[in-house]
Amino acid sequence: MRAVVQRVKKSTVTVNDKVAGSIGQGLMVLLGVGREDDDRDIEYLSDKIMNLRIFEDENGKMNKSLLDIGGQLLVVSQFTLFGDCRKGRRPGFDKAGKPEIAKELYERFVNKCREAGVLTETGIFQADMLVDISNDGPVTLLLDSKKEF
């Protein structure tokens, strides 16, 4: 499971000119599910994201987590995070999870975050989405549950 995590002041995802999800201060997460992913990946990544200390404390040091600040989460599915661009000029997506399995894992990830008490909004799985991100910092991190990077 891979994630692009961005600290945001606000973020909105729109599908067919209708807002599907919108948050204030928190994290915008583009989430990709891989073929080999399972519940262990959900546990690892959800815990890592909710507890990353990337929000500033009173001294301006990145020392607070999403949970610490009562921040919100916007999760958008993004299978292209598993795009392999090493050969040729067109990415290959062989390592991306099959849609029916990926959707289930994506939904379980979202539910895990909600169960932790985080207000969590989402896009629509497999939809063509427009994502507006007001990146704060900017702070952007790449995470991989298999720790490939």
Curated annotation (Swiss-Prot):
Reactions listed under catalytic activity: glycyl-tRNA(Ala) + H2O = tRNA(Ala) + glycine + H(+); a D-aminoacyl-tRNA + H2O = a tRNA + a D-alpha-amino acid + H(+)
Catalytic EC class: hydrolase
Compartment(s): Cytoplasm
GO MF annotations, alphabetized: D-tyrosyl-tRNA(Tyr) deacylase activity; Gly-tRNA(Ala) deacylase activity; Ser(Gly)-tRNA(Ala) hydrolase activity; tRNA binding
Record motif Gly-cisPro motif, important for rejection of L-amino acids, residues: 137-138
Highest taxon, organism lineage: Bacteria
Keywords from the UniProt entry: Cytoplasm, Hydrolase, RNA-binding, tRNA-binding
EC numbers for this chain: 3.1.1.96
Record's signal peptide: none
Claim: Cytoplasm is one of the keywords in the record: yes
InterPro entries for this protein: Daa-tRNA_deacyls_DTD (IPR003732), DTD-like_sf (IPR023509)
GO terms for cellular component: cytoplasm
GO biological process: D-amino acid catabolic process
Predominant cellular place of this UniProt entry's protein: cytoplasm
SUPFAM superfamilies in the record: DTD-like
Family in the record: Belongs to the DTD family.
Domain comment in the entry: A Gly-cisPro motif from one monomer fits into the active site of the other monomer to allow specific chiral rejection of L-amino acids.
HAMAP family: Deacylase_Dtd
PANTHER family (alphabetical): D-AMINOACYL-TRNA DEACYLASE 1, D-TYROSYL-TRNA TYR DEACYLASE
Subunit organization: Homodimer.
Protein's job: An aminoacyl-tRNA editing enzyme that deacylates mischarged D-aminoacyl-tRNAs. Also deacylates mischarged glycyl-tRNA(Ala), protecting cells against glycine mischarging by AlaRS. Acts via tRNA-based rather than protein-based catalysis; rejects L-amino acids rather than detecting D-amino acids in the active site. By recycling D-aminoacyl-tRNA to D-amino acids and free tRNA molecules, this enzyme counteracts the toxicity associated with the formation of D-aminoacyl-tRNA entities in vivo and helps enforce protein L-homochirality.
Name of this protein: D-aminoacyl-tRNA deacylase
Gene it is expressed from: dtd
